[in-house]
Amino acid sequence: MLSTRLALRSNIPMADFTTWRVGGPAQWLLEPASVDETLEALQWAQQEHLPCRVIGAGSNLLIHDDGLPGLTLSLRKLQGASLNAENGVVEALAGEPIPTLARRAARAGLNGLAWSVGIPGTVGGAAVMNAGAQGGCTADWLESVRVAPLVGGVSFELSRDELDFDYRHSRLQDEELVVLSARFRLEPGHDPEEITRITSGNLSHRTSTQPYTQPSCGSVFRNPEPLKAGRLIEGLGLKGNRVGGAEVSTLHANFIVNTGAATAADIDSLIQRVQQQVEAAHSLHLHPEVKRLGFTEAA
Protein backbone atom coordinates (compact mmCIF):
# COMPACT_ATOMS: atom_id res chain seq x y z
CA MET A 1 0.00 0.00 0.00
CA LEU A 2 1.17 3.49 -0.85
CA SER A 3 0.96 6.20 1.77
CA THR A 4 -1.56 8.98 1.27
CA ARG A 5 1.33 11.36 0.52
CA LEU A 6 1.79 9.74 -2.88
CA ALA A 7 -0.95 10.22 -5.47
CA LEU A 8 -0.94 7.32 -7.92
CA ARG A 9 -2.24 8.36 -11.34
CA SER A 10 -2.89 6.26 -14.42
CA ASN A 11 -2.79 6.79 -18.19
CA ILE A 12 -0.95 10.12 -17.95
CA PRO A 13 0.37 11.62 -21.23
CA MET A 14 4.14 11.83 -21.00
CA ALA A 15 4.19 14.73 -23.46
CA ASP A 16 3.47 16.86 -20.39
CA PHE A 17 6.67 15.57 -18.75
CA THR A 18 9.21 15.99 -21.57
CA THR A 19 10.80 19.11 -23.02
CA TRP A 20 10.13 17.80 -26.54
CA ARG A 21 6.41 17.72 -25.67
CA VAL A 22 5.96 14.23 -27.13
CA GLY A 23 5.33 10.81 -25.65
CA GLY A 24 2.40 8.49 -25.05
CA PRO A 25 0.76 7.67 -21.71
CA ALA A 26 2.42 6.21 -18.64
CA GLN A 27 0.44 3.27 -17.29
CA TRP A 28 1.13 4.48 -13.75
CA LEU A 29 2.77 7.70 -12.57
CA LEU A 30 4.10 8.88 -9.22
CA GLU A 31 5.73 12.22 -8.38
CA PRO A 32 7.54 11.91 -5.04
CA ALA A 33 8.53 15.15 -3.33
CA SER A 34 11.03 13.73 -0.82
CA VAL A 35 13.71 11.06 -0.62
CA ASP A 36 11.50 8.94 1.65
CA GLU A 37 8.64 9.12 -0.84
CA THR A 38 11.01 8.17 -3.66
CA LEU A 39 12.22 5.11 -1.77
CA GLU A 40 8.62 4.19 -0.95
CA ALA A 41 7.65 4.43 -4.62
CA LEU A 42 10.55 2.18 -5.66
CA GLN A 43 9.56 -0.36 -3.01
CA TRP A 44 5.92 -0.28 -4.15
CA ALA A 45 6.89 -0.95 -7.77
CA GLN A 46 8.92 -3.94 -6.65
CA GLN A 47 6.08 -5.28 -4.51
CA GLU A 48 3.65 -4.93 -7.41
CA HIS A 49 6.14 -6.51 -9.85
CA LEU A 50 5.98 -3.45 -12.09
CA PRO A 51 8.77 -2.31 -14.37
CA CYS A 52 9.93 1.10 -13.18
CA ARG A 53 11.45 4.02 -15.06
CA VAL A 54 12.75 7.20 -13.46
CA ILE A 55 12.80 10.58 -15.18
CA GLY A 56 13.80 14.08 -14.14
CA ALA A 57 12.99 17.23 -16.10
CA GLY A 58 12.29 15.19 -19.23
CA SER A 59 15.10 16.79 -21.23
CA ASN A 60 17.42 14.49 -23.17
CA LEU A 61 14.48 12.09 -23.28
CA LEU A 62 12.40 10.65 -26.14
CA ILE A 63 9.37 8.62 -25.06
CA HIS A 64 7.58 6.38 -27.54
CA ASP A 65 4.15 7.43 -28.81
CA ASP A 66 2.68 4.22 -27.36
CA GLY A 67 3.76 5.29 -23.89
CA LEU A 68 5.32 3.31 -21.06
CA PRO A 69 4.08 0.21 -19.24
CA GLY A 70 4.52 -0.15 -15.50
CA LEU A 71 5.46 2.71 -13.18
CA THR A 72 7.03 5.96 -14.30
CA LEU A 73 8.61 7.90 -11.47
CA SER A 74 8.97 11.62 -12.14
CA LEU A 75 11.41 13.33 -9.78
CA ARG A 76 10.64 16.86 -10.91
CA LYS A 77 9.08 17.64 -7.50
CA LEU A 78 12.09 16.27 -5.59
CA GLN A 79 13.57 19.74 -5.19
CA GLY A 80 15.66 21.54 -2.62
CA ALA A 81 19.26 22.57 -2.03
CA SER A 82 21.51 23.92 0.71
CA LEU A 83 24.53 26.07 -0.13
CA ASN A 84 27.39 26.83 2.24
CA ALA A 85 29.01 30.10 1.19
CA GLU A 86 31.92 29.50 3.59
CA ASN A 87 33.24 26.15 2.34
CA GLY A 88 31.52 25.86 -1.05
CA VAL A 89 29.64 22.65 -0.27
CA VAL A 90 26.30 22.40 -2.08
CA GLU A 91 23.82 19.63 -1.31
CA ALA A 92 20.96 19.29 -3.79
CA LEU A 93 18.09 16.87 -4.26
CA ALA A 94 17.90 15.07 -7.60
CA GLY A 95 14.98 17.05 -8.99
CA GLU A 96 16.50 20.47 -8.31
CA PRO A 97 16.68 22.35 -11.64
CA ILE A 98 20.27 22.98 -12.68
CA PRO A 99 19.60 26.59 -13.79
CA THR A 100 18.04 27.39 -10.40
CA LEU A 101 21.05 25.95 -8.60
CA ALA A 102 23.46 27.87 -10.84
CA ARG A 103 21.75 31.17 -10.06
CA ARG A 104 21.67 30.48 -6.32
CA ALA A 105 25.35 29.57 -6.36
CA ALA A 106 26.17 32.82 -8.15
CA ARG A 107 24.26 34.88 -5.59
CA ALA A 108 26.21 33.11 -2.83
CA GLY A 109 29.55 33.97 -4.45
CA LEU A 110 30.22 30.33 -5.34
CA ASN A 111 32.09 29.74 -8.58
CA GLY A 112 31.68 26.53 -10.57
CA LEU A 113 28.20 26.25 -12.06
CA ALA A 114 27.96 29.34 -14.28
CA TRP A 115 28.30 27.14 -17.39
CA SER A 116 25.17 25.17 -16.46
CA VAL A 117 22.60 27.97 -16.30
CA GLY A 118 21.08 27.19 -19.70
CA ILE A 119 20.83 23.43 -19.29
CA PRO A 120 17.14 22.42 -19.09
CA GLY A 121 17.74 19.54 -16.70
CA THR A 122 17.95 18.48 -13.08
CA VAL A 123 20.80 17.70 -10.70
CA GLY A 124 20.11 13.98 -11.02
CA GLY A 125 20.07 14.04 -14.79
CA ALA A 126 23.25 16.12 -14.88
CA ALA A 127 25.04 13.54 -12.75
CA VAL A 128 23.84 10.63 -14.88
CA MET A 129 24.75 12.28 -18.20
CA ASN A 130 27.78 14.25 -16.99
CA ALA A 131 26.01 17.24 -18.49
CA GLY A 132 28.22 20.00 -19.77
CA ALA A 133 28.31 23.22 -21.75
CA GLN A 134 30.66 26.07 -22.60
CA GLY A 135 33.77 24.29 -21.41
CA GLY A 136 32.38 23.06 -18.08
CA CYS A 137 30.85 19.78 -17.01
CA THR A 138 29.25 18.16 -13.98
CA ALA A 139 32.26 15.96 -13.23
CA ASP A 140 34.41 19.04 -12.62
CA TRP A 141 32.47 19.99 -9.50
CA LEU A 142 30.52 16.95 -8.31
CA GLU A 143 31.87 15.38 -5.12
CA SER A 144 29.41 12.51 -4.61
CA VAL A 145 25.89 11.27 -5.22
CA ARG A 146 23.46 9.30 -3.06
CA VAL A 147 21.73 6.58 -5.04
CA ALA A 148 19.25 3.77 -4.52
CA PRO A 149 18.93 0.54 -6.50
CA LEU A 150 15.99 0.59 -8.89
CA VAL A 151 14.97 -2.80 -7.53
CA GLY A 152 15.48 -3.51 -3.83
CA GLY A 153 18.24 -2.48 -1.46
CA VAL A 154 19.08 0.59 0.58
CA SER A 155 20.55 3.90 -0.55
CA PHE A 156 24.30 4.43 -0.57
CA GLU A 157 26.86 7.01 -1.62
CA LEU A 158 29.17 6.99 -4.62
CA SER A 159 32.16 9.30 -4.81
CA ARG A 160 33.17 11.15 -7.94
CA ASP A 161 35.96 8.65 -8.60
CA GLU A 162 33.49 5.78 -8.38
CA LEU A 163 31.23 7.30 -11.04
CA ASP A 164 33.65 6.63 -13.93
CA PHE A 165 32.92 9.95 -15.60
CA ASP A 166 33.65 10.40 -19.29
CA TYR A 167 32.35 12.73 -21.99
CA ARG A 168 28.54 12.79 -21.48
CA HIS A 169 28.76 9.52 -19.60
CA SER A 170 28.89 8.00 -16.13
CA ARG A 171 28.46 4.51 -14.71
CA LEU A 172 24.95 5.59 -13.70
CA GLN A 173 23.92 5.07 -17.34
CA ASP A 174 24.99 1.44 -17.18
CA GLU A 175 23.52 0.42 -13.83
CA GLU A 176 19.98 0.41 -12.46
CA LEU A 177 20.56 3.12 -9.86
CA VAL A 178 18.37 6.09 -9.01
CA VAL A 179 20.05 9.36 -8.04
CA LEU A 180 18.45 10.80 -4.89
CA SER A 181 20.80 13.72 -4.21
CA ALA A 182 24.21 15.11 -5.06
CA ARG A 183 26.98 17.01 -3.33
CA PHE A 184 29.05 19.61 -5.16
CA ARG A 185 32.14 21.40 -3.91
CA LEU A 186 32.34 24.85 -5.47
CA GLU A 187 34.84 27.68 -5.05
CA PRO A 188 33.74 30.07 -2.27
CA GLY A 189 34.71 33.67 -1.73
CA HIS A 190 33.97 35.13 -5.15
CA ASP A 191 32.16 38.39 -5.81
CA PRO A 192 28.45 37.49 -6.20
CA GLU A 193 27.91 40.31 -8.70
CA GLU A 194 30.76 39.09 -10.89
CA ILE A 195 29.64 35.44 -10.84
CA THR A 196 26.06 36.53 -11.52
CA ARG A 197 27.27 38.61 -14.47
CA ILE A 198 29.15 35.63 -15.92
CA THR A 199 26.18 33.34 -15.35
CA SER A 200 23.79 35.76 -17.05
CA GLY A 201 26.20 36.16 -19.94
CA ASN A 202 26.35 32.40 -20.43
CA LEU A 203 22.56 32.23 -20.52
CA SER A 204 22.36 35.08 -23.02
CA HIS A 205 24.85 33.29 -25.27
CA ARG A 206 22.82 30.07 -25.20
CA THR A 207 19.51 31.77 -25.86
CA SER A 208 20.94 33.67 -28.82
CA THR A 209 22.61 30.65 -30.46
CA GLN A 210 20.13 27.86 -29.65
CA PRO A 211 16.35 27.44 -30.22
CA TYR A 212 15.57 28.23 -26.60
CA THR A 213 11.89 29.06 -27.15
CA GLN A 214 10.97 25.91 -29.09
CA PRO A 215 10.38 22.44 -27.60
CA SER A 216 13.58 20.41 -27.89
CA CYS A 217 15.70 18.04 -25.83
CA GLY A 218 18.82 20.18 -25.95
CA SER A 219 21.70 18.81 -28.01
CA VAL A 220 20.65 15.63 -29.81
CA PHE A 221 24.06 14.13 -30.58
CA ARG A 222 27.32 13.82 -28.72
CA ASN A 223 30.18 15.65 -30.39
CA PRO A 224 32.53 13.21 -32.14
CA GLU A 225 35.50 15.02 -30.61
CA PRO A 226 37.38 16.99 -31.76
CA LEU A 227 34.61 17.61 -34.33
CA LYS A 228 31.27 19.27 -33.58
CA ALA A 229 28.07 17.41 -34.46
CA GLY A 230 26.22 20.63 -35.27
CA ARG A 231 28.83 21.72 -37.79
CA LEU A 232 28.82 18.32 -39.52
CA ILE A 233 25.02 18.43 -39.80
CA GLU A 234 24.97 22.04 -40.98
CA GLY A 235 27.69 21.30 -43.52
CA LEU A 236 25.38 18.80 -45.19
CA GLY A 237 22.66 21.41 -45.57
CA LEU A 238 20.32 19.70 -43.13
CA LYS A 239 19.17 22.79 -41.24
CA GLY A 240 15.41 23.03 -41.72
CA ASN A 241 15.12 19.38 -42.75
CA ARG A 242 11.80 17.97 -41.53
CA VAL A 243 9.91 14.79 -40.80
CA GLY A 244 6.32 15.58 -39.93
CA GLY A 245 6.38 18.16 -37.15
CA ALA A 246 10.05 17.56 -36.28
CA GLU A 247 12.67 19.88 -37.74
CA VAL A 248 16.45 20.26 -37.61
CA SER A 249 16.71 23.70 -36.05
CA THR A 250 17.61 26.51 -38.42
CA LEU A 251 19.43 28.20 -35.52
CA HIS A 252 21.61 25.28 -34.34
CA ALA A 253 21.87 22.06 -36.34
CA ASN A 254 22.45 19.82 -33.30
CA PHE A 255 18.93 20.60 -32.12
CA ILE A 256 15.73 18.98 -33.34
CA VAL A 257 12.66 21.03 -32.49
CA ASN A 258 8.98 20.24 -32.26
CA THR A 259 7.32 22.77 -34.55
CA GLY A 260 3.95 22.14 -32.93
CA ALA A 261 2.56 18.75 -33.89
CA ALA A 262 5.55 16.41 -33.87
CA THR A 263 5.31 12.83 -32.68
CA ALA A 264 8.06 10.75 -31.12
CA ALA A 265 8.10 8.75 -34.37
CA ASP A 266 8.76 11.96 -36.35
CA ILE A 267 11.68 12.86 -34.11
CA ASP A 268 13.08 9.33 -34.14
CA SER A 269 12.92 9.20 -37.94
CA LEU A 270 14.67 12.55 -38.26
CA ILE A 271 17.41 11.46 -35.86
CA GLN A 272 18.02 8.38 -38.01
CA ARG A 273 18.00 10.41 -41.23
CA VAL A 274 20.65 12.77 -39.85
CA GLN A 275 22.75 9.83 -38.65
CA GLN A 276 22.55 8.13 -42.05
CA GLN A 277 23.54 11.24 -43.99
CA VAL A 278 26.46 12.09 -41.70
CA GLU A 279 27.67 8.50 -41.82
CA ALA A 280 27.43 8.41 -45.62
CA ALA A 281 29.34 11.68 -45.99
CA HIS A 282 31.95 11.34 -43.25
CA SER A 283 32.01 7.65 -42.22
CA LEU A 284 31.12 8.81 -38.69
CA HIS A 285 28.28 7.48 -36.57
CA LEU A 286 26.71 10.23 -34.48
CA HIS A 287 25.74 8.87 -31.07
CA PRO A 288 22.62 10.45 -29.55
CA GLU A 289 22.77 12.04 -26.13
CA VAL A 290 19.05 11.31 -26.01
CA LYS A 291 17.74 8.47 -23.86
CA ARG A 292 14.95 6.59 -25.63
CA LEU A 293 12.18 5.03 -23.53
CA GLY A 294 9.65 2.54 -24.89
CA PHE A 295 11.65 1.81 -28.05
CA THR A 296 12.88 -1.73 -28.69
CA GLU A 297 15.74 -1.04 -31.09
CA ALA A 298 18.93 0.89 -30.37
CA ALA A 299 19.56 4.28 -31.98
From Swiss-Prot:
Q: Domain of life, per the record?
A: Bacteria
Q: What main location does UniProt list? A: cytoplasm
Output the NCBIfam families linked to this UniProt entry: murB (TIGR00179), PRK13905.1 (NF010480)
UniProt cofactor(s): FAD
What function does this protein fulfil? Cell wall formation.
A cellular-component GO term for this protein:
cytosol
User: Which species is this UniProt entry from?
Assistant: Parasynechococcus marenigrum (strain WH8102)
Q: Which reaction does it catalyse?
A: UDP-N-acetyl-alpha-D-muramate + NADP(+) = UDP-N-acetyl-3-O-(1-carboxyvinyl)-alpha-D-glucosamine + NADPH + H(+)
UniProt keyword Cell membrane present: no
Pinpoint the FAD-binding PCMH-type domain residues. 21-189
* PROSITE patterns membership: FAD_PCMH
Which pathway does UniProt place it in? Cell wall biogenesis; peptidoglycan biosynthesis
What Enzyme Commission number(s) does the record list for this chain? 1.3.1.98
Catalytic residues?
R168, S219 (proton donor), E289
User: Molecular function (GO) terms listed?
Assistant: FAD binding; UDP-N-acetylmuramate dehydrogenase activity
Task: Please give the biological process terms from Gene Ontology that the record holds.
Answer: cell division; cell wall organization; peptidoglycan biosynthetic process; regulation of cell shape
| Keyword entries, A-Z | Cell cycle, Cell division, Cell shape, Cell wall biogenesis/degradation, Cytoplasm, FAD, Flavoprotein, NADP, Oxidoreductase, Peptidoglycan synthesis
| Protein name as catalogued | UDP-N-acetylenolpyruvoylglucosamine reductase
Q: Which family does it belong to?
A: Belongs to the MurB family.
Could you tell me which InterPro entries the record lists for this protein? FAD-bd_PCMH, FAD-bd_PCMH-like_sf, FAD-bd_PCMH_sub1, FAD-bd_PCMH_sub2, MurB, MurB_C, MurB_C_sf, Oxid_FAD_bind_N
Which compartment or compartments is the protein found in?
A: Cytoplasm
What's a Pfam family this protein contains?
Answer: FAD_binding_4
